[in-house]
A protein has these predicted regions:
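Short catalytic micro-motifs in class I SAM-dependent methyltransferases
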Residues: 115-116
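A short glycine-rich, Lys/Arg-flanked "PGG" loop and its adjoining helix->strand segment in the class I
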Residues: 124-136
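Class I SAM-dependent methyltransferase SAM/SAH-binding core
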Residues: 50-100
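Conserved Class I S-adenosyl-L-methionine
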Residues: 3, 32, 163, 167, ...
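Conserved class I S-adenosyl-L-methionine
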Residues: 1-47, 60-61, 139-167
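Nucleotide donor/acceptor-binding cores
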Residues: 48-49, 106
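A conserved beta-strand element that flanks and buttresses the S-adenosyl-L-methionine
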Residues: 112
C-alpha cells in the first residue's frame, strides 16, 4: 500500500483544504472541456432522484447536483474537514470509507466517484460496494486522470508519469468491467498553463511528490502542459 491509498495518509492529506485548493488552482488556466461538466452531464443524463458521491471534497459537485438536478444527494468522505465543508453547503454529508459503505443494497440511482478511486485501500472491494448500493438500473460515474496527465511538468522534475495509484485512465476500464456489465469511456483532453515557475512549484509542492518541487528549473516562458482525464459511465 502506498501513501495514495493508505487511509491514514489520505486523511492527513485532506485534514484541511489548503493543499487541495492549491492543486485545484491549475484549473484557472485550463483549456478544453471542463471535466467536472462532463461528470455532471453524465449524472444528469440518468435523471436520478437519489445520488451518492464518494470522495466529495469541498462539496461543490454535490451541492450542484442537489440544486440543479433536484436530487437527494448524500456525500461521503474520509476527511472530517471535507464533510464539514460539504455540510455547510446544505448537503447531507458523512464521514466514511468507500470500501465499507454504510448503506443498504440498491439505495441510489447513481453513484459518483470523481478523482478518488485511486485513494481506495482495496479497489475491487470499493467497486463491489459501489455496485451493491446502486439500483439494478442505476449507474456509477467515475473519473480519473491519465498516467500522462500533466506529463511535461513531471518530466521537468524527473518523474516518470503523473503520481497516481491503481486507478488511472489506462487501468480503469478493465477494473470497472470486472464489476459492471457496460462501461463507456469519455476522454477529455486539453492543456493547463503554469504562468510562472512559482505557480508550477506551488502545484508540485502540494502533491505526494512535494520533495521534487525544488528540482524544477527556471522557466523563461509560461509552461503549457497537456491534460488527459476520462469519465467512465458504468451500468450494472
Amino acid at each position: 500500500m502506498s501513501s495514495i491509498n493508505d487511509p491514514d495518509a489520505v486523511r492527513r492529506e485532506y485534514a484541511d483544504e489548503k493543499r487541495y485548493a492549491a492543486r485545484m488552482a491549475k484549473q484557472e488556466t485550463a483549456t478544453g472541456p471542463d471535466p467536472y461538466e462532463v461528470v455532471f452531464g453524465a449524472v444528469a443524463e440518468q435523471e436520478p432522484q437519489e445520488v451518492l458521491e464518494v470522495g466529495c471534497g469541498r462539496g461543490e459537485l454535490a451541492e450542484r447536483m442537489s440544486r440543479e438536478l433536484r436530487a437527494h444527494v448524500v456525500a461521503l468522505d474520509q476527511s472530517a474537514r471535507m464533510v464539514e465543508l460539504t455540510a455547510a453547503r446544505g448537503v447531507e454529508a458523512i464521514v466514511g470509507d468507500v470500501v465499507d459503505l454504510p448503506f443498504r443494497d440498491g439505495s441510489f440511482d447513481c453513484a459518483v466517484a470523481a478523482w478518488m478511486l485511486y485513494h481506495a485501500s482495496d479497489l475491487d472491494r470499493a467497486l463491489v460496494e459501489l455496485r451493491r448500493v446502486v439500483r439494478p438500473n442505476g449507474c456509477l460515474v467515475a473519473a480519473t486522470s491519465s498516467e500522462r496527465n500533466l506529463a511535461e511538468v513531471w518530466e521537468l522534475v524527473g518523474e516518470i508519469g503523473a503520481p497516481g495509484g491503481g486507478f488511472t485512465v489506462e487501468s480503469a476500464e478493465p477494473a470497472l468491467r470486472r464489476h459492471f456489465g457496460h462501461v463507456e469511456q469519455r476522454d477529455v483532453f486539453g492543456t493547463v498553463t503554469f504562468p510562472t515557475r512559482e505557480a508550477a512549484h506551488s502545484y508540485i509542492a502540494n502533491t505526494r511528490t512535494a520533495e521534487t518541487a525544488d528540482r524544477l528549473p527556471e522557466l523563461d516562458t509560461p509552461l503549457v502542459v497537456s491534460r488527459h482525464v476520462a469519465i467512465f459511465v458504468c451500468a450494472r
